[in-house]
Amino acid sequence: MYLNNYQHLKNKETYLLFFLFLFSFLIRIPVIFIFGDTRLDNEWGIIVNNLTDYGKFSLVNFGDFFVPSLFMPPLYAFYLYFFKIFHFNNEIYIQVVLFSQIILSSFSVVIFYNINKLFFSNKICILGTLIFSLFPLHIYACAQISSIILQSFLMITFFYFFLKIMKKNNFYNICFLSLASGLLILLRGEFIALFLLSILYLALFIKINLKSILIIILLTFVVISPYLMRNIIVLDTITITKSIGFNLWKGNNPQTDVEGKNYIYGSIFDQEDLDLREQINKVPEDKYYEINLDKVFLSEGIKNINNDPIKYFGLYLKKILSFLFIDLNSSNPYYYHPLHYLPVLFISITSIIGIILSKKNSYQINFLILFFIVNVAIVSVFFILPRYKLAIIPLQIIFSNIFFEYIKKNFFKT
């Protein structure tokens, strides 16, 4: 009898997960055809075309010399390049990329449901998962050539296996946590700091054994090692990306705002700041070009902050509030559409209430809160684009679910 009931519940859950995946997949398809990008633009287009035409991972070239690039994290560029090997025409190629992002997004919904199961009742799990699936920003992002969907998928995978390790420290969970960690490091430069924070949390608060910690670090290193070795051999530097200077300057210069203005990599050579333009023009055109260029921007960004610390601290706080809630001065034409800002504002407010109501003795929830705070604090040092919000929406929904669970238990008792 017990086994029959267990099997029935497992079958019921399987059907639910299949429904969540299929539902999420189908509702995203029309968005591709209505709002979907139609070509590779800006940095992604340059790198992928150079990979395709010349076999060079490069963003800048001087004639026939292609500068080995460190500016862009490599994972999404190679993700885009993977679909190029099938020699689709441009229209089909873009559609295939966008459909692949729909698949990742739909799997994210399924994994997100499993995360919620660790904390909440079945009704709240389903509610939170449907909010994530139907969240307009999440749906819209699938139609854009951007790394944010891949980041969201990997981040949710990371959270799932991290939380699983807290309960069951086995090699299976360690392998998938390490894989997600390595890929996230190859996708987002700031994740290195978040990874180290997570490892420290496992060691200090969860107190998992040293052997497991070392295996996680080793396997993560194995994932990033091919690209890391490329940078060591070709550019004599131990790093994944080298764009912290540009990103710091983009978010902290006299003309900037929360979004860092509309500076793209190619526009940096047309500066109104004559002194900065002169420094850029003096950078030697060799294989270390991007490294030395980033040093120029790093120096300039630090100088800006030192010259007017009150202004840039105020801007930093403004970026934090814009990241947590909404940006009151966004340049994005769709940002103030009610389908965007109302869900964002609602889930942002309810998530803060959820954090306040959360159990302070829960190591799992405490980790998510700590990760959330540190992530927001790090990213806000630079600039906040509207799509960045999707990276923290899953955590905000989890925190909101704490509030929804509180309402359910206290006002809808059965």
Show the residue positions of the predicted features.
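Short helix- or helix-capping micro-motifs
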Residues: 21-27, 125-136, 160, 181-185
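Membrane-proximal lumenal/periplasmic loop motifs of glycosylation machinery
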Residues: 31-42, 54-81, 303-307
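Short hydrophobic/aromatic helix or loop-helix immediately within or flanking a transmembrane segment
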Residues: 45-51, 66-89, 316-324
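Loop-to-helix entry region of an early transmembrane alpha helix in multi-pass inner-membrane enzymes
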Residues: 74-78, 86-107, 126, 141-144, ...
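Transmembrane-helix signature of polytopic, membrane-embedded enzymes
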Residues: 95, 107-134, 152-153, 172, ...
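Transmembrane-helix motifs of polytopic, lipid-linked glycan transferases
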Residues: 99-119, 157-161, 349-356
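Membrane-interface transmembrane helices that cradle and orient dolichyl/undecaprenyl
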Residues: 119-122, 158-176, 184, 202-208, ...
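Membrane-proximal stem/loop segments at transmembrane-domain junctions that anchor or position
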Residues: 235-318
